[in-house]
């Protein structure tokens, strides 16, 4: 194969859903190296794994070894979030935390609700001491995360409540919609930068 790079992906821990098993379901872990881990929320009516699959494929195409995990309890908000108790609770299993710790960089796809984005990121980074890029629909900034104690590259909180650090943010990626090429290019650029490249 001229001009192509082959990636071996050990996929997947659980059966796929939908026609032909094309939709990854909760509990999926697809191992492809230990550079980057793309983290998706649990699929459901509001959580679609589609942009994560496109992002993962684009990163692998750019020769960045990218694994994927779909969280078991990715819907809802963490127990300590202001809006907790109104529905399902977001959480991480010990196995998910260990899988995240095995990678150099986390690329976490969150949604379009500001509180959900910030508090989910805080729970993940409270448990995992890794740099993280947040991908979401809502236009959040570093200050939004720092206000609730999340360490960020640009703004440090007065009282840090996380081990990990947010190193970059890509907003405008809509759940369930095809990810535009300019957003994929932005993600690739920011991932390469976070890994120490240009």
From Swiss-Prot:
Keywords: Methanogenesis. It comes from the Archaea. InterPro entries: Me_CoM_Rdtase_prot-C (IPR007687). GO terms for biological process: methanogenesis. MCR is composed of three subunits: alpha, beta, and gamma. The function of proteins C and D is not known. This is Methyl-coenzyme M reductase I operon protein C. The gene is mcrC.
